[in-house]
Amino acid sequence: MPSESGGTGPPSGLPRNQTGWRNSIRRYGSLSIGLHWLMLVLLATVYASIELREFFPKGSDPREALKLWHYMLGLSVLVLVLLRLAVYMIGPVPRIEPEPAAWQKLLAKLMHFALYVLMIGMPLAGWLILSAEGKPVPFFGLELPALVGENKDLAKVADEIHETAGVVGYWLIGLHAAAALFHHYIARDNTLRRMLPLRD
C-alpha cells in the first residue's frame, strides 16, 4: 500500500505493523486502538460496579462508593465515545481483507450504530435520572449541571429506559465480541487484527 511519502511501506519509517496514532487504510492507529480497549475496560467496570452494589446493604459506604464510581465512569464513557467519533471522522476506516459479504457489512454497520447509541444514550440517561431526582451529578470532584429540574415522574421513566438499555447492552457487547471471533477464526479476515495493538 502506498505511504504518504509515495513508497510502499508504512509512513515515517514505522514498522509494517505500526501506523502511528492515526488510522490508515490497513489498520487502526494507536489512538483508536487505545480508545477501543479503554472503553471496553470502562464498560466492564461500569457494569460490574452496579451489579456488585447488590451485595451490600442500602445506605452502606461500599454500596454508595460503587454507585458513585458507576456514575463517574459511565460519564467517562460518554466523553471517550465522543472523542472516538471525532477520531473516526478525521481518519480512514481500515479495510477488511478479504472483503466480507454485503450482508455482513450491513450487519456490522447496524451493530456499530447500536453500540454508539448505547454508549451515548446510557450515560445521558443516567445524567438525566440524577438531575430529575434533584441529586448532584458527580464527576471526579466536579458537579455537573442538571439537565432538567426535579421531576420524579421523569426520573422514573428515565430509570426504566436506563435499566432496559443496560440489559440490551449485555447482548450488544456479547454479539460484538462473538462477531469479532467469527471473523478471526472462521472468516479468517483481519477484522480483529486491525484493532490489536501489537500484531497485524
Region spans (language model):
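Membrane-embedded alpha-helical bundles that constitute the cytochrome b-like, heme-associated redox core
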Residues: 1-200
